[in-house]
Regions:
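Acyl-donor-binding surface of acyltransferase catalytic domains
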Residues: 1-42
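Conserved beta-strand-loop-alpha-helix junction that forms the acyl-donor binding cleft
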Residues: 9-14, 138, 147-158, 174-181
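Conserved catalytic-core motifs of GNAT/GCN5-like acyltransferases
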Residues: 23-34, 167-181
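Short amphipathic alpha-helix that is part of the acyltransferase structural core
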Residues: 35-69, 93
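A conserved beta-strand-loop-helix scaffold within acyl/acetyltransferase catalytic domains
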Residues: 70-81, 85-117
Length: 181
């Protein structure tokens, strides 16, 4: 961890370490998609593109407005990410990343869906559901089971995940740690 950087640890309260401050817990639901269930359709209103680490600044910018604190520039190296871009009205300007989803934690045979977010100006169009379904199809192709973690108070995301077929497995604690210095 870099000085002043924050990270999150799943599970039990981590032991005290010099230079690391405990900043509290966030209750989350751990959800899983049944391995034998039919996959939901991917109904994206705009094309879905593979994202690379070259897109990391746009990915961080999106998460900073949609769900701050959980995505960093190097998170892109942890798995495959996909996004939906909104074309700029001025052709001389770059497109804007308006929604994304990917994977962060890979523990065979499970892969964690992560970074699911939509820019507030584009919510309600099914983008998060389409991207989540896209990642689920990607997982099925590699014989992986899709799992995810969602903050327990994020009712809209929980509804989307249930509609896609995810089942709640258990509640877990996500512990926030910050490096001092």
């Amino acid at each position: 961890m870099e000085p002043a950087e924050t990270t999150y640890v799943l599970g039990e309260v981590p032991p005290s370490e010099g230079g690391i401050a405990y900043r509290g817990a966030i209750p989350c639901l751990q959800m899983g998609f049944p391995e034998d269930a039919a996959l939901p359709a991917v109904n994206a209103p705009l094309p879905i593109s593979a994202l690379t680490c070259a897109d990391a600044p746009a990915m961080v910018a999106l998460t900073d407005v949609a769900f701050p604190g959980f995505f960093r520039l190097r998170t892109c190296v942890m798995g495959s990410y996909f996004g939906i871009w909104h074309p700029a009205s001025d052709p001389t300007q770059p497109s804007q990343l308006i929604a994304m989803a990917g994977e962060r934690l890979i523990l065979h045979p499970s892969r964690e869906i992560s970074g699911v977010c939509t820019h507030p100006n584009f919510r309600g169009q099914g983008l998060a559901a389409a991207l989540t379904a896209h990642v689920m199809h990607h997982h099925r192709q590699t014989h992986a089971r899709s799992v995810l973690h969602v903050v327990s108070t994020n009712d809209s995301a929980i509804r989307i995940y249930h509609r896609l077929g995810f089942e709640t497995l258990r509640e877990v604690q996500l512990h926030r740690l910050k490096r001092l210095e």
